[in-house]
């Protein structure tokens, strides 16, 4: 694996952090400011769908309205007052300071208001000249109202707020309409703003007030007292969310919002920084697979010049990701790992501002506070030995992910083993079929996604993988999940050898291997349930079934034919030569095989069964097929299939006939591999529930 591509012909990559400046912008928004705070439930319910929506931007703010003098001394009229909406003070000292900013100015205006009220005490109360004190500010979506519509002249000194309007229960509708029309005529409000306030008033007034006022009651002192009662906020005991009975003071203001890369989703950022319109071959990145702290993407050739930018965008938008890798080639290694490049890595300090990065407390192994097991320490010590360079050892630790799946913990050396998070549902489905007392033989186990949860469930496990790193980390994961040593056995051998030794000894009771002999002698390791065999290597798993093929009944072959026959016998001889000491009644003929394969045929079910039969050497009768399942889509025309079956009666008859002392030698059953499933016999069909949820691609 390489940390960077070595193709000299590739275009120079953009600087990863440069995209942040390109997406930085400011936006001026219209905002609705109101008092009292008790009206929040009702107002926010009415404004639902009308508020500004942007990632990491609060659309409802707590503000303190502070009136300040515009600089024209000697005047206390409202036209000479500018209202600033500040953040609430963090402590009492700041609160006192902000409340004293314009104490003298506020006293002058209050005296003028009281004098005006005395001269005309019989008229309905007028709204205040400006808001003051604690308020709520709601940022409006530009499609509802733009700041430029409120204040066409951006240099206007009075661009701070509009007149205050009194809305809600107890306020005559005619009076509200009159005030809004006056504001329209004087240019204080645009039509869209007036319509919004009219809608707010009608919705707020729809709640039945404690008293109804009409124009005829304006001169009634008792009605004036009732109006003041309506305008007063309800007591906390009578307050209900979404309902408010009383008057609300409302005005409009502007708010400048700065937008950075933190305010956009990953798809939005990629559409902004990648020239998707200019380059027809450059398509939007659909997503990525996350394994622990590692994000895995499959970039096309058109994406490669922007690989570092794509990696940085993924890091910026996903705090749990600290490394981004790109798959370079298809899986071709016998160990099933794939070549990858690191296109993004979260540093311990941000390169731009020096701030500690999000993943600064994540170690190179991708852990956050988890203690290492003894087995894992041994593996790390081995990797840090002279066999590996320091850079390679660090790379291996950095690409070892900590994954939790279905209640189990896994260490996954992602660059050295095969792991597919999209198979999570399939792991749970198959393990869900097993019961305590069952025995699982996992022929291609990887790091144990089938084996570990099965063992944790009380299933005795024999897990094998040809990849020595996978076998090492299976032991790590067994210790990490505190599995008993006598219930979890790890092997590192070829799959055919595992089938011909460990599985054969267990099914027939031959117990030829020392490990199996020791295990079966333990009372807790006897199979009291069912044996399961999983072969989860869909590209070639069916080919391993050739160990069960019958021997050729041709007695004499010549030249090259004899050589080829000898090779075939070496593969499948074990399952065609039953030892004399084996008791036929002790053979478990109910062992259930779960074999995975790929299919692109129109009839997926029939094709999956044909693949099994062609490599097994026997036709599967309907009673031998328990389930044929489509696991997931791999490509538009390619599916991953699972055939669950038992070995057919013809196989067992052939095996028993091969035991010394029986009449006749091993024979080939009449049902050859060319035969299809009997007419009208259909296997059980069940489509995985996860099929609709899993994305395409390996």
From Swiss-Prot:
Q: What does this protein do?
A: Specifically methylates the N1 position of guanosine-37 in various cytoplasmic and mitochondrial tRNAs. Methylation is not dependent on the nature of the nucleoside 5' of the target nucleoside. This is the first step in the biosynthesis of wybutosine (yW), a modified base adjacent to the anticodon of tRNAs and required for accurate decoding.
Give a Pfam family name. TRM5-TYW2_MTfase
Q: Which family does it belong to?
A: Belongs to the class I-like SAM-binding methyltransferase superfamily. TRM5/TYW2 family.
Question: SUPFAM superfamilies this protein is in?
Answer: S-adenosyl-L-methionine-dependent methyltransferases
Q: Quaternary form?
A: Monomer.
Q: Name one GO cellular component term.
A: nucleus
Q: Which pairs are disulfide-linked? A: none
According to its UniProt entry, the protein's GO biological process terms are: tRNA N1-guanine methylation
Q: Spell out the subcellular localization from the entry.
A: Mitochondrion matrix; Nucleus; Cytoplasm
Q: What is its main location?
A: mitochondrion
**Binding residue positions for S-adenosyl-L-methionine:** 427, 465-466, 494-495, 536
EC number assigned by the record: 2.1.1.228
Could you tell me the keywords of this UniProt record? Answer: Cytoplasm, Methyltransferase, Mitochondrion, Nucleus, S-adenosyl-L-methionine, Transferase, tRNA processing
Q: Where is this region: Disordered?
A: 207-242
Any idea what this protein is called? tRNA (guanine(37)-N(1))-methyltransferase
Give the reactions, separated by semicolons, that this protein catalyses. Answer: guanosine(37) in tRNA + S-adenosyl-L-methionine = N(1)-methylguanosine(37) in tRNA + S-adenosyl-L-homocysteine + H(+)
Q: Which GO terms describe its molecular function?
A: tRNA (guanine(37)-N1)-methyltransferase activity
